[in-house]
Amino acid sequence: MEASLLKKNQSIELTIEDLTHDGSGVGKIDGYPFFIPNTLPGEKVTAKIIKLNKNYGFARMENIETVSANRVEPPCAVYSKCGGCSLQHLSYDGQLEFKRNQVEETMKRIGKLNVEVPETLGMENPWRYRNKSQVPVGFVNGKLTAGFYQKRSHAIIDMSTCLIHNEQGDFAVQKTREILAKYGTEPYDEQTGKGDIRHIMTRFAHTTGQLMIVLVTTKERMPFKEEIVRDLVEQLELTSIVQNINPHKTNVIFGDRTKTLWGKDIIEDTIHGIRFAISARSFYQVNPLQTEVLYQQAIDAAELTGEETVIDAYCGIGSISLCLAKKAKHVYGVEIVDQAIQDARANAELNELANTTFETGKAEEVIPSWYKAGIVADVLVVDPPRKGCDEKLLETILAMKPKKVVYVSCNPGTLARDMKILTDGGYVAKKVQPVDMFPMTTHIEAVTVLHLN
């Protein structure tokens, strides 16, 4: 069939050749590509065209004529509707290979780099891994419910469990939902801006078993607040109940004010023997088992002897910094969020690690000022957001010339771009190691070390 004859709502037959970075299958008709969710390479499918652009189209899978050996039945009852997961229909071995291929292809296409990409480091059990849940509250069929948003919408799915949340947090969400419904709590309405409760959040500490519930409300006063807290304490094993007040008409989850309603202000967890105090709003990795794997890769790559000065750009609450401080002469950390820096200093004190300095600011501004003041890193660690490293920071790295740059990435595209700049500037990378921090989703973390040539 010629691509020029295609029309919306038409049924087409095609073979899926590849997966995109977001997990959709790609098949072509007369060289014209279609993106089709919930399909896998090698599958011959019938699909209905839902949108046609000049150079590509979108279709919805109607039937699979030839099924991939990697296809599995998704165990989640709401998988087809929910926006939380996107790869449950792909076997876990298939997911790990998909992520490895994504990294390898991105290194070649964007970075023009010929580096080794070993097998993705995955989980023995890729379920129930998330230590944090943030669940919107709303009305579904006239009753209060808490669940994830449907794909590409803000309609809430009424769900009894989430298979990637840890059991304790999952159970706590359901109990909290029941208690709120018991007292007739009114969910927040995004359209009108009315209602009392916006989100239920849970945080669970894997190593200590401590559990925090956060109620995100529209105002400080909330009907039956004391009774709700009493019931939560009676029915759940909790360390902390916190209220966050967000009065703004926005889809941002948190407001600026947080108060503890019961118990402690924080819960405590450990990574590689380092203790971390985690507040309601602290940034903390959501997969504790794989965080240990990811950080071990960074620790091994740094090859510290105790004599090195380390700079950790984008240090957050100091999670990588403090793991490295056990083996380094001194670690300097910088982070743009002031509360995270306060947390990092508190965590350094908690672990009696005096060989650390933390400063609030942009990495691309603070690190050049350190360099001018004579602070030169032997090892520089970057763990940037999805947009990658700022250009000015990369220029400073090339001027400072640390012996090693350890790069922890959550976006293979910007990792490849930044590696190209560093390798053009005299660094050499031999391999990029993918780590699966988020099974059942398309998110990819990777670690590499670049040596000064």
UniProtKB/Swiss-Prot annotation:
Biological process, per Gene Ontology: rRNA base methylation
EC number: 2.1.1.-
Active-site residues per Swiss-Prot or TrEMBL entry: C410
Enzyme's top EC category: transferase
Matching InterPro entries: MeTrfase_TrmA_AS (IPR030390), MeTrfase_TrmA_CS (IPR030391), NA-bd_OB-fold (IPR012340), SAM-dependent_MTases_sf (IPR029063), TRAM_dom (IPR002792), U5_MeTrfase_fam (IPR010280)
Gene Ontology terms, MF aspect: 4 iron, 4 sulfur cluster binding; metal ion binding; rRNA (uridine-C5-)-methyltransferase activity
Listed Pfam families: TRAM, tRNA_U5-meth_tr
UniProt: [4Fe-4S] cluster binding residues: C76, C82, C85, C162
Entry keywords, A to Z: 4Fe-4S, Iron, Iron-sulfur, Metal-binding, Methyltransferase, S-adenosyl-L-methionine, Transferase
Residues annotated as binding S-adenosyl-L-methionine: Q285, Y314, E335, D383
Record-annotated TRAM domain positions: 5-63
Protein family: Belongs to the class I-like SAM-binding methyltransferase superfamily. RNA M5U methyltransferase family.
Protein name: Uncharacterized RNA methyltransferase lmo1751
